[in-house]
Swiss-Prot record:
Complex and partners: Tetramer of two alpha and two beta subunits.
Organism encoding this protein: Pseudomonas aeruginosa (strain ATCC 15692 / DSM 22644 / CIP 104116 / JCM 14847 / LMG 12228 / 1C / PRS 101 / PAO1)
PROSITE patterns given in the database record: B5 (PS51483), FDX_ACB (PS51447), TRBD (PS50886)
Co-factor binding details: Binds 2 magnesium ions per tetramer.
Superkingdom: Bacteria
All residue ranges annotated as the B5 domain in the record: 400-476
HAMAP family: Phe_tRNA_synth_beta1
Reactions that this protein is recorded to catalyse: tRNA(Phe) + L-phenylalanine + ATP = L-phenylalanyl-tRNA(Phe) + AMP + diphosphate + H(+)
Name the record gives this protein: Phenylalanine--tRNA ligase beta subunit
GO MF term list: ATP binding; magnesium ion binding; phenylalanine-tRNA ligase activity; tRNA binding
Cofactor(s) in the UniProt record: Mg(2+)
Gene it is expressed from: pheT
Length: 792
């Protein structure tokens, strides 16, 4: 909620400084996100009047103007497209200082002298409008200081409200808070009933009373929309971050900001028959005020006539029934819509308006008539017209009702940590316009006004007491708790350890959204139905991820597009598998690498990463819990990975993850030119390991044998190593694959695997006969199982 401080002080004016007011608002829960001057720092700028203009003799786009400051006439060269005789504008005379220390001096533009400058709103930092000069009203007093005339000694304050405080989405609500905080009088705007000048009405039917229990309408005839919106209203709207459109729309927006009641005005000539508040027909079409055509769903509340929908209730009006320059008669609407009925509807159509923002958070159910009278009076004052009687339809059974709440003094003491005086409790609650009636010793019955729809429980009342009394005045008491010993198994590798390990290996941690673009989901997990959000932040964040890879690859792509040629990212987080029925949320650890193997340097940084670099990182992660031997890498398939560079990561036969190169077709669709390698692991399987087993270092020599084995191309090296370990006996201390060869001198259907085996006995020296016998057993077992032979 953004508003003018000067406007707020016209309702409730505590004798405190701007800074103190801002600080106090934040302290009572109305957190101030921003407070800025309404204009830049400038001086020497007055209201000027352009008396005449003529073409510059040496520039097509410049005009030579004669400008009056009320006492003298000055020649000013101006290039603004809207400069014309009779226009009143901000005139910066010689010696004036504009924002950013820009001083106005006598100048010569293309040979013509200029004695000052005519200013746009942007040049004075009043707004971002820069299409031409800031046009002032025709009755602006020539010669008056612009800061005085526009009342620029003001601040715009923006408060970030929690969803339950919809009552503060208006000047009236904020003024009530300020009045209560500082115990100063509240001076609301006077709203009197406007007498009808004719009998014309339009019948109103509530076909969906649960969604719209109250609807008011009024016909106003013979309005003149050629009249401008007065400057005071335009300025108050601008300082509330609302652009002036036309007098009628400006009035409805003004009343919304002032009182908190969203309103809408229809062109009466476009309403066929009466007004029906109903649910939309499934598939019904409506062109909105912003020009987009939408297809309505049956769960959407609409304002309609007897032929078609006119507006999405509480969200946006339709284009064909909207007010235009040719409108002469209005149908003015004010209604109360149920919060639940409108919740999420705007977002479901890709919309968000000031009206929907308020109705979704709650609007005073008793406010509509007051807002109707206020808007009617403003419209009559600005564009004239003849008002008719108000037509109101109400379903009392569906209006919200709040029963009195019992407040106990002992409960207040218990929750605040200190007693509050009974008189103080009554004073604070009455300051918020709550009715308080004593109901026994230390107990009250509290009535809640219709605008405080966030208060329904005793704890809500106690929260209000704490806010107004001051959180900073409550006693500080530290919580007392028993510290329990850490029962985490010693064999468990915690996630922080894995994070540090990957960082040490050159990775950087990424955090990406759990919801992704459905199109990206389909690329990584084709054929799987994603779990979609009913009310996503945006259309490209509508699917819950079934893998961490989509977010990681997008982050990697983002870095590559910003001249980062070597990228190594990892992420830990949840993936979501299945639909709501039987949904699995699994903690995962994933990584993505591309670019050079090592940072650029004189002795390295030339070779790119490959499959085995990613595999080495995965092995380091798996080894962190001391259970690397439980895992194996098995050739596999995954739709997002290269068909020839994909490994299933298994733990004792259970699938725990995947490792591989990004599929070339997927890389092409994502415009990734460099090879990208990915891994993803089930975190629960990775962190559970084994305690290390300690044994005495052997004092006896090691014995090593190297074997060059010829096997078929399709035999995984992992299977060979597993078989060797099984046949090598208990004294095998190290086994390494140090070479893979296929080419000249080798059958094209075979490959050569060179492995090194190291044995060491803890209490004696192994002799050659023992080692040779074991080696022969290994060769025999490999020959029997894999048709392996020694390379000669």
């Amino acid at each position: 909620m953004k508003f003018s401080e000067k406007w707020l002080r016209s309702w409730a004016n505590p004798q405190v400084s701007h800074d103190e007011l801002v600080a106090r608002l934040s302290m009572v829960g109305l957190e101030v996100d921003a407070d800025l001057p309404v204009a830049g720092a400038f001086s020497g700028v007055v209201v000027g009047e352009v008396l005449s203009t003529e073409q510059h003799p040496d520039a097509d786009k410049l005009r030579v103007c004669q400008v009056s400051n009320g006492s003298e006439t000055f020649q000013v060269v101006c290039g603004a497209p809207n400069v014309r005789a009779g226009l009143k504008i901000p005139f910066a005379m010689i010696g004036a200082e504009l924002p950013d220390d820009f001083k106005i001096k006598k100048a010569k533009l293309r040979g013509v002298e200029s004695f000052g400058m005519l200013c746009s709103a942007k040049e004075l930092q009043i707004s971002e409008e820069n299409a031409g000069l800031l046009e002032l009203p025709a009755d602006a007093p020539v010669g008056q200081d612009v800061r005085t005339y526009l009342e620029l000694a003001d601040y715009t304050i923006e408060v970030g409200l929690t969803p339950n405080r919809g009552d503060c989405l208006s000047l009236a609500g904020l003024a009530r808070e300020v009045s209560a905080i500082y115990d100063v009088p509240l001076a609301p705007v006077a709203v009197d009933a406007v007498a009808a000048q004719h009998d014309e009405t339009r019948p109103v039917e509530l076909a969906a009373p649960a969604a719209c229990p109250r609807y008011l309408g009024r016909v106003i005839r013979n309005v003149d929309l050629s009249r401008p919106t007065p400057l005071w209203m335009v300025e108050r709207l601008r300082r509330s971050d609302i652009r002036s459109i036309d007098p009628v729309v400006d009035v409805t927006n003004y009343v919304m900001i002032e009182l908190g009641q969203p309103m809408h005005a229809f062109d009466l000539a476009e309403i066929n028959g009466g007004v029906r508040v109903r649910m939309a027909e499934d598939g019904e079409k409506l062109v909105l005020l912003d020009g987009q055509e939408i297809t309505l769903r049956a769960d959407t509340l609409v304002i309609a006539d007897h032929q078609r929908a006119l507006a999405i209730a509480g969200v946006m009006g339709g284009e064909h029934s909207g007010v235009s320059d040719s409108t002469r008669d209005l149908f003015l609407e004010a209604a109360f819509f149920d919060t639940i009925a409108l919740a999420g509807k705007a977002r479901s159509y890709g919309l968000h308006t000031d009206s929907s923002h308020r109705f979704e958070r709650g609007v005073d159910s008793q406010l509509a008539r007051k807002a109707m009278e206020r808007a009617t009076r403003l419209i009559l004052d600005i564009v004239g017209g003849e008002p008719g009687p108000i037509v109101e339809q109400v379903s009392e059974a569906h209006l919200p009702k709040v029963a009195p709440i019992t407040l106990r003094a002992e409960r207040v003491t218990q929750m605040l940590g200190m007693p509050l005086d009974a008189a103080e409790i009554v004073r604070l609650l009455q300051a918020l316009e709550l009715t308080v009636v004593a109901d026994g010793e230390g107990q009250w019955s509290v009535g809640v006004p219709s605008h405080r729809f966030d208060i329904s429980l005793e704890v809500d009342l106690i929260e209000e007491l704490a806010r107004l009394y001051g959180y900073n005045r409550l006693p500080v008491r530290y919580p007392q708790a028993r510290l329990a010993p850490n029962n985490k198994p010693e064999a468990r590798a915690a996630l922080p350890l894995l994070r540090r390990l990957l960082v040490a290996r050159g990775y950087q941690e990424a955090i990406t959204f759990s919801f992704i673009d459905p199109a990206l989901f389909e690329l990584f997990d084709p054929g799987t139905q994603p779990l979609t959000l009913a009310n996503p932040i945006s259309a490209d964040m509508a699917a819950m991820r079934s893998s961490l890879w989509p977010g990681l690859v997008k982050a990697l792509q983002h870095n590559l597009n910003r001249q980062q040629s070597r990228v190594r990212l990892f992420e830990s987080g949840l993936r979501f598998v299945g639909q709501l029925e039987g949904l699995k949320q699994e903690a995962m650890l994933a990584g993505a690498i591309c670019g050079k193997r090592l940072p650029e340097g004189w002795a390295n940084g030339r070779d790119g990463v490959d499959f085995f670099d990613a595999k080495a990182d995965v092995e380091a992660v798996l080894a962190s819990a001391g259970a690397l031997g439980d895992f194996s890498f098995v050739p596999g398939e995954h739709p997002a990975l290269h068909p020839g560079q994909t490994a299933r990561i298994e733990r004792e036969g259970r699938l725990v993850g995947y490792l591989g190169a990004l599929h070339p077709e997927l890389a092409k669709k994502l415009d990734l030119e460099q090879p990208v390698f990915l891994f993803e692991l089930l975190l629960a399987e990775v962190v559970d390991g084994h305690l290390p087993k300690f044994r005495e270092l052997s004092r006896f020599p090691e014995v090593r044998r190297d074997l060059a084995l010829l096997v078929d191309q399709d035999v995984p090296a992992q299977d060979i190593l597993t078989q060797i370990r099984a046949a090598a006996g208990e004294w095998l201390t190290d086994l390494r694959l140090f070479d893979v060869y296929h080419g000249k001198g080798i059958d094209p259907h075979r490959k050569s695997l060179a492995v090194g085996l190291t044995w060491q006995h803890p209490s004696r020296t192994l002799n050659d006969d023992e080692v040779n016998s074991t080696t022969q057993n290994i060769v025999t077992s490999l020959e029997e199982r894999f048709n392996a032979t020694l390379r000669k």
